[in-house]
């Protein structure tokens, strides 16, 4: 499949969160081992007007990648045991990122099962911490480009509008009202909390709040 170029990531965060659905995330390790998965759930985070965003209070050493060029990875550690993978969005200097919340495993499944300690394919990547573990991604890829050779996205058919669900984001305590979670309603691989329903019509424009 064709790799997605830099122009794909040069989109407003809310738009990118939806455009990422259905795309193929590829992880290539130094050993040559390749794992692939289809993105089926995302969440958008904006540095401006979004108190749930790590960059809401400005740049720190931890969140500096969010202010960098789009199409790079912002990876952070949470709950004392999980890494979370985000794709940086917005123009350089403006904080924004899309959390990869769930994926459908496609290739290298045996390796994913070994890492996760489960044979259940539905449970392999049905959460942000799970998918990072399945792909073998940690802090060593913080700030890395999706135009490189360690990770990249491949193009795939766009998900039909009627199969895209929208809901508030999960597991946050601030800005909980913002409907910035996107997911493929027909996928059995989304996280266990299925909120919201398929959207019936496209908004005129996806804008920041």
UniProtKB/Swiss-Prot annotation:
| Entry similarity comment | Belongs to the DNA glycosylase MPG family.
Q: What is this protein called?
A: Putative 3-methyladenine DNA glycosylase
Q: What class of enzyme is it?
A: hydrolase
**EC number(s) in its UniProt entry?**
3.2.2.-
Q: Where is the composition biased (Basic residues)?
A: 197-209
Please tell me whether the keyword Hydrolase is annotated for this protein. yes
Checking SUPFAM superfamilies in the record gives: FMT C-terminal domain-like
Instruction: Please report the organism this UniProt entry assigns to the protein.
Output: Chlorobaculum parvum (strain DSM 263 / NCIMB 8327)
Supply the alphabetized keyword list: DNA damage, DNA repair, Hydrolase
Return the PANTHER family for the record. Answer: DNA-3-METHYLADENINE GLYCOSYLASE
């Amino acid at each position: 499949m064709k790799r997605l170029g830099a122009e794909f990531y040069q989109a407003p965060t809310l738009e990118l969160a939806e455009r990422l659905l259905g795309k193929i995330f590829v992880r290539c390790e130094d050993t040559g081992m390749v794992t692939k998965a289809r993105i089926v759930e995302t969440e958008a985070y904006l540095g401006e007007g979004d108190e749930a965003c790590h960059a809401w209070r400005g740049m720190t050493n931890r969140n500096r990648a969010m202010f960098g060029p789009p199409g790079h990875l912002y990876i952070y550690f949470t709950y004392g045991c999980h890494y979370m993978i985000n794709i940086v969005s917005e123009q350089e200097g403006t904080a924004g990122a899309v959390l990869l919340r769930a994926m459908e495993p496609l290739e290298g499944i045996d390796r994913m099962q070994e890492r996760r300690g489960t044979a259940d394919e539905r449970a392999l990547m049905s959460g942000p911490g799970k998918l990072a573990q399945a792909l073998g991604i940690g802090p060593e890829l913080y700030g890395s480009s999706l135009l490189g050779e360690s990770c990249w996205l491949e193009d795939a058919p766009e998900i039909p509008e009627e199969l895209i669900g929208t809901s508030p984001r999960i597991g946050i305590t601030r800005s909980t009202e913002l409907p910035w979670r996107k997911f493929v309603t027909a996928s059995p691989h989304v996280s266990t909390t299925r909120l919201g329903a398929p959207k019936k019509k496209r908004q005129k424009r996806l804008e920041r709040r």
